[in-house]
Amino acid sequence: MKKIIVMMSLLLLFVVSCGSSKEFSIDVDGKGKVPNFEIKDLNGKTIESGKILNNGKKTLFIVAAEWCPHCKEEMPEVQKFYDANKDKVNVVVVFTNNQSSLGKVQTYVKNNQYTFPIYYDESGAIARGFNVTGFPFNVKINNEKVEETLELPVDFDSLTASFAK
């Protein structure tokens, strides 16, 4: 019996370590510093977040779910904002694995023809790191710090006003 418990513990440890990304935590309300973390695009390419968040531009950072009605409402507005501001503002949309899959997200993005940068939170580490409790989750990041949590729902005009500050 003791051997079975040890084997099960080792198996659980192995599964958890293989499937998890490096964990982090950000004090979003306290406008915390955003640490560097790994993020995957929809093709499975791993990118260091610093390369997309710390390039001298403010960043609209969204954690969303393809099944979320409010996210579906916001995404066309985000696309419009991206088209008008892509040279001045980073737009980073991270779709969660919560009740979803990479395939579902890829299909959703393709069907809606979104062209802004899209990533997939395979392990849920990004949603946990930003302490996301609901979708969509929208923040403005500037100089590696959370500058503002954006009120929901966001639209083109509210995004334009927020990033004009």
How would you label these PLM feature ranges?
Residues 56-59, 87-90, 115-116, 143:
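Loop/turn elements at helix/coil->beta-strand transitions in domains of secreted/extracellular proteins
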Residues 1-4:
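Positively charged n-region of N-terminal signal peptides that target proteins for export
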Residues 33, 57, 133-134:
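Short, small/polar residue-rich loop motifs at catalytic or cofactor-binding pockets
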Residues 72-111, 125-128:
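Structural microenvironment flanking redox-active thiols in thiol-disulfide oxidoreductases
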Residues 19-51:
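N-terminal "domain-start" segment that seeds a small globular fold
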Residues 49-72, 92:
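Short active-site neighborhood of thiol/selenol oxidoreductases, capturing the structured segment around
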Residues 110-114, 122-164:
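Thiol/disulfide oxidoreductase modules built on the thioredoxin-like
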